């Protein structure tokens, strides 16, 4: 059975049993700042399980895209480890419990293929239950599982919690007996290679207290509502139903592996048994390639692009491991163009958007491979040198400083340094590397604390939210309103009041203040309460539904429970709204010219200006940028109506509303339309008509990272003022040149060209002046102990290069058979410098230019025995430097 069919049957089974089919959340864990990626099927439902939000459905089913990388080094070595995987899951939020969850799972697993099930042999399924979970045990008995195949296990195996105080409960796992060829009989407790877990049913029924470790925590009591969270690894089930040994051999992965084997001339499985950990290195590398290429496809498909930070670095590391693995197998050409299309064909039956978006995905993948191959060539050479030097010095490890230099200067990742060093029997001072990295991060983030808004502990916010519910935002339609202060928060948490001079956080019951989000800067303004007034400095939403105003008390006091008047800076809001609407127009226009791969990667909507970051593998030509600007302003002239409305996510997608990569949307979304020109999911504020923007002027386009470009623009009166200043500047230049303004650029180019020619001529004349006396100076050489010595000062204004050239020119005009030393001193910016040139005949007498310079500068300076230089002494010391060299020759 194909993996896509397993997925379809799973969703269909639970949809037929009253479950809402919920799309997978994107791989980036947008809703949790502490996580990079979604790693479990239940993650998008956590707010429902914790009671932070009310679920819009009682029961749900999904197939969640997941990524786990802590064990990335084990990928390919065992049958259990992979980076990307899919988790089938069915969930109940206070609806059904064990008595329905277990039969639902059993029915799908054992129902015949013809009837829509998976057709597993009931005699080969072994359920496990928690030690004292008699309830689950009895349900398993009721569906027909004999007692000797129901295994009771302890807390470490069959009791689930999130690792923190909160929901917890026993779980029941389903294992499938793959047969005696895979190991010992006796059930999951005896051999988990033979008995493969394929489904875990978690029964959330208790609340746990604080504790350490996996088992050391108290059970505080029952939850008000009991929940179900199940997870079936899609790849695990596919390996069972397709009769293959491991997840690398299922239909969504094996074609990639086979193509890699074909390219490298390797025969997969020639050295393997059933246990993947016993495989030959060639097989391990082929599995790494297959796993990582598929993962790269899915990550880029979900909007992640290669970089040196966060999610982008994980993608970069995965891609580079795949590329290096296939090179170690013997393939030295570009691999991604050969493998990525195969991965697309494997995954697009379940994710058709991968085929539609493949042009963009391929652009990033191929560009990253090209960049890495260049890095690999340079970095490997440097690393090989470092390894050789360490061995010569008798060291068994590469220093942390060398590893850091490879990473920081050459972009050579530390994991690759560790891997290559290990292959050559060397270690790396990883602790020293981490220390240097920590120092660098500390410097880069020195001001992070100063910029931080809000409490480290979010519990204060959650308490306010739980007690009063979500804050109502009214700012779409009004700029001021009467509001009640629900809470006053200080650094230590809630407080009764704040007095003049205090900076606190205020929570109102309703507010017209927009909280920073979606690239839009927050509203500023004032809140007047009783006899007090506060200035709003910042507005944030630290937890969903709670708008928090960071404010300074200007006079009087502010108390929780008082009613007052909240008023935003309306002029600032209008300017920000103009910028936000302009960003939508720039986004759509970029896609018009560059294609749908030009997706938004970030934005800033500030008063009078915008910054728009977008994904594209190459820069934007100036001519295209001009066309984009013109088309945006034509949309302004059309005075299009700007309309915002709320609809279902499915309907928004149907009408073509753009959604941002990586964003997690609810069932209901807000759509902003600018006529028929642009349509985008957005929660920000906008103008009523496009004509209200006035003018958009693009200032610049630049790179801010691999595959990410940035456009900056001015909007409205700021754009007009900029153009007015530019006009005055051009008019002034036209006046100076006495030409029409449209000829100014040509005249400036002509002036610059003339200036460059003059500089070249000046340089030529200066060189002639400096070198013109070289022959005469050589003829005036004096004898110092059988050595021809020329000591002279360079003409005023001579450059450092001129001085070196003069010294060598004089040396070249002295008979090579005659030992000669030339010393040329120079004065520049109040300092004296010296260049010494020594010919080969003088070298044979034991004279060294480097030694003579060090004699003149008390050990400082340097160079080769033939040519050396030094500097830094006061200009008046120039004659003395020449005498010192002469004396050094005399004493040699």
Curated annotation (Swiss-Prot):
UniProtKB keywords: Aminoacyl-tRNA synthetase, ATP-binding, Cytoplasm, Ligase, Metal-binding, Nucleotide-binding, Protein biosynthesis, RNA-binding, tRNA-binding, Zinc
EC class name: ligase
Subcellular localization(s) per the UniProt record: Cytoplasm
Annotated cofactor note: Binds 1 zinc ion per subunit.
InterPro entries: aa-tRNA-synth_II/BPL/LPL, Ala-tRNA-lgiase_IIc, Ala-tRNA-ligase_IIc_anticod-bd, Ala-tRNA-synth_IIc_core, Ala-tRNA-synth_IIc_N, Ala-tRNA_ligase, Ala_tRNA_ligase_euk/bac, Thr/Ala-tRNA-synth_IIc_edit
Biological process annotations from GO: alanyl-tRNA aminoacylation
Cited Pfam families: tRNA-synt_2c, tRNA_SAD
Gene Ontology MF terms: alanine-tRNA ligase activity; aminoacyl-tRNA deacylase activity; ATP binding; tRNA binding; zinc ion binding
SUPFAM superfamilies: Class II aaRS and biotin synthetases (SSF55681), Putative anticodon-binding domain of alanyl-tRNA synthetase (AlaRS) (SSF101353), ThrRS/AlaRS common domain (SSF55186), Translation proteins (SSF50447)
Protein name as it appears in the record: Alanine--tRNA ligase
Organism this protein belongs to: Salinispora arenicola (strain CNS-205)
């Amino acid at each position: 059975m194909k993996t896509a069919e397993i997925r379809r049957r799973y969703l269909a089974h639970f949809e037929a049993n009253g479950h809402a089919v919920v799309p997978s959340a994107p791989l980036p864990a947008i809703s949790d700042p502490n996580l990079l990626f979604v790693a479990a099927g239940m993650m998008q439902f956590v707010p429902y399980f914790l009671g932070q939000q009310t679920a819009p459905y009682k029961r749900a089913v999904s197939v969640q895209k997941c990524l786990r990388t802590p064990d990335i080094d084990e990928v390919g070595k065992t049958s259990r480890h992979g980076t990307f995987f899919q988790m089938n899951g069915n969930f109940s939020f206070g609806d059904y419990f064990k008595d329905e969850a277990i039969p639902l799972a059993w029915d799908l697993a054992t129902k015949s293929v013809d009837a829509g099930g998976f057709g597993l042999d009931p005699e080969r399924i072994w359920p496990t239950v928690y030690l004292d979970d008699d309830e689950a045990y009895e349900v398993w008995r009721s569906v027909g599982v004999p007692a000797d195949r129901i295994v009771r296990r302890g807390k470490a195996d069959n009791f689930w919690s999130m690792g923190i105080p909160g929901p917890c409960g026993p779980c029941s796992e389903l294992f499938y007996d793959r047969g005696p060829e895979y190991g010992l009989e006796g059930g999951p407790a005896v051999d988990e290679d033979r008995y493969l877990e394929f489904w875990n049913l978690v029964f959330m029924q208790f609340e746990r207290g604080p504790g350490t470790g996996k088992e050391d925590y108290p059970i505080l009591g029952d939850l008000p509502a009991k929940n179900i969270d199940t997870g079936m690894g899609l790849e695990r089930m596919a390996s069972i139903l397709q009769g293959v040994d491991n997840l690398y051999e299922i239909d969504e992965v094996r074609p990639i592996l086979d193509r890699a084997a074909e390219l490298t001339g390797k025969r997969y499985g020639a050295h393997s048994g059933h246990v993947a950990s016993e495989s030959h290195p060639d097989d391990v590398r082929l599995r790494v390639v297959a796993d990582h290429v598929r993962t790269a496809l899915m990550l880029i498909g979900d909007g992640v692009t290669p970089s040196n930070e966060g999610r982008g670095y994980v993608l970069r590391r995965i891609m580079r491991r795949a590329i290096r693995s296939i090179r170690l197998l013997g393939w030295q050409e570009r691999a991604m163009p050969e493998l990525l299309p195969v991965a697309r064909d494997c995954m697009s039956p379940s994710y058709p958007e991968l085929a539609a978006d493949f042009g963009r995905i391929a652009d990033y993948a191929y560009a990253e491979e090209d960049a890495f191959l260049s890095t690999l060539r340079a970095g490997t050479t440097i690393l090989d040198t470092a390894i050789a030097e360490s061995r010569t010095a008798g060291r068994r490890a590469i220093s942390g400083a060398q590893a850091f230099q490879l990473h920081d200067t050459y972009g050579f990742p530390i994991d690759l340094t560790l891997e290559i060093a290990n292959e050559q029997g060397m270690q790396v001072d990883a602790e020293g590397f981490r220390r240097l990295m920590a120092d660098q991060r500390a410097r880069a983030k020195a001001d992070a604390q100063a910029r931080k808004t809000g409490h480290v502990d979010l519990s204060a916010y959650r308490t306010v939210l739980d007690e009063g519910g979500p804050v109502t935002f009214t700012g779409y339609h009004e700029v001021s309103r009467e509001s009640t202060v629900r809470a006053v928060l200080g650094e230590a948490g809630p407080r009764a009041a704040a007095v003049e001079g205090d900076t606190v956080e205020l929570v109102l019951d309703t507010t017209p203040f927009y909280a920073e989000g979606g690239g839009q800067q927050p509203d500023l303004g004032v809140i007047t309460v009783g006899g007090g007034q506060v200035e709003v400095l910042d507005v944030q939403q630290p937890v969903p539904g709670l708008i928090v105003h960071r404010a300074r008390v200007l006079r009087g006091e502010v108390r929780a429970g008082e009613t007052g008047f909240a008023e935003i800076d309306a002029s600032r809001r209008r300017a920000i709204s103009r910028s936000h609407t302009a960003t939508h127009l720039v986004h759509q226009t970029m896609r018009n010219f560059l294609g749908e791969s030009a997706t938004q990667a970030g934005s800033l909507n500030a008063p009078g200006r915008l910054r728009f970051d977008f994904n594209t593998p190459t820069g934007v030509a100036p001519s295209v940028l001009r066309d984009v600007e013109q088309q945006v302003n034509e949309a302004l002239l059309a005075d299009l109506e700007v309309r915002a409305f709320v609809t279902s996510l499915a309907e928004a997608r149907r009408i073509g509303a753009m959604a941002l990569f990586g964003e997690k949307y609810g069932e209901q979304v807000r759509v902003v339309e600018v006529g028929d020109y642009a349509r985008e999911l957005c929660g920000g504020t906008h103008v009523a008509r496009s004509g209200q923007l006035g003018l958009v002027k693009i200032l610049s386009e630049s790179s801010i990272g691999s595959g990410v470009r940035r456009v900056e623009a001015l909007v409205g009166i700021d754009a007009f003022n900029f153009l007015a200043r530019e006009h005055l500047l051009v008019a002034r230049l036209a006046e100076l040149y006495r030409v029409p303004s449209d000829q100014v650029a040509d005249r400036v180019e002509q002036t610059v060209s003339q200036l460059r020619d003059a500089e070249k001529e000046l340089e030529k004349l200066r060189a002639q002046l400096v070198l013109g006396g070289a022959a005469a100076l050589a003829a005036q050489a004096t004898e110092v102990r059988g050595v021809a010595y020329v000591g002279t000062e360079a003409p005023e204004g001579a450059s450092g290069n001129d001085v070196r050239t003069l010294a060598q020119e004089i040396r070249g005009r002295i008979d090579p058979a005659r030992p000669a030393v030339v010393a040329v001193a120079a004065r520049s910016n109040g300092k004296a410098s010296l260049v010494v040139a020594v010919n080969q005949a003088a070298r044979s007498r034991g004279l060294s230019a480097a030694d003579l310079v060090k004699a003149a500068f008390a050990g400082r300076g340097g160079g080769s025995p033939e040519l050396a230089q030094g500097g830094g002494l006061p200009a008046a010391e120039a004659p003395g430097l020449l005498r010192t060299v002469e004396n050094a020759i005399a004493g040699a």
